[in-house]
Regions:
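Compositionally biased terminal segments of proteins
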Residues: 1-173
Length: 173
């Protein structure tokens, strides 16, 4: 993963992407036991093209393609790792980028979303694998409950959390 992160850090240094943070299942491995995952989710801050209200990943893909990296579906294979770039288009993702934690992976500097932001994004996404990851976080005891509660309130996710609790946590704690 070191080489993959080196490419992403170079993209940031050259202004192709703004601030970034690792999210998804790989982000969760910084807090939980590693799980099988196929890709690295990289949430990125992107500038809108001048005169447009749309955010585009075209500069990211153009940059990587010009350096010989190949696309496979929604991923770009960077030094052996499938990477999915996800624009931070909402306030939750933007906050997650702002509050991401700096760390090192195999000597490469990077940023990873906080566990609480990973849970909030997974809750909003709402797939079965997201709920399973949330359960792992809850059972691990690594979450700051007050911080998670604040994030859920700020981003209108309290009702979804309550539904999650009823479905998955009632009687299990």
């Amino acid at each position: 993963m070191k080489e993959t992160l080196a490419v992403i850090n170079q993209m940031q240094a050259e202004g192709v992407i703004g601030r970034y943070a690792i999210g998804g299942a790989v982000g969760a491995t910084f807090y939980l036991e590693p799980s099988a995952t196929l890709d690295i989710d990289i949430f990125v801050a992107l500038e809108n093209p001048q005169g447009s209200s749309l955010v585009t990943l075209a500069p990211v893909y153009d940059y990587l393609r010009s350096r010989g990296f190949k696309s496979e579906e929604e991923h770009v294979i960077i030094e052996g790792w499938p990477v999915q770039f996800l624009p931070a288009t909402g306030t939750l993702e933007e906050e997650a980028l702002e509050q991401a934690v700096e760390t090192e992976v195999e000597g490469a500097r990077t940023r990873v979303m906080t566990g609480e932001h990973l849970v909030a994004i997974a809750l909003r996404t709402g797939r079965a694998k997201d709920f399973a990851r949330i359960l792992q976080f809850v059972e691990s005891g690594v979450l700051d409950a007050a911080r998670l509660d604040s994030i859920l309130k700020q981003h209108g996710l309290v009702e979804k959390w309550e539904q999650f609790e009823v479905k998955f946590l009632r009687g299990n704690l």
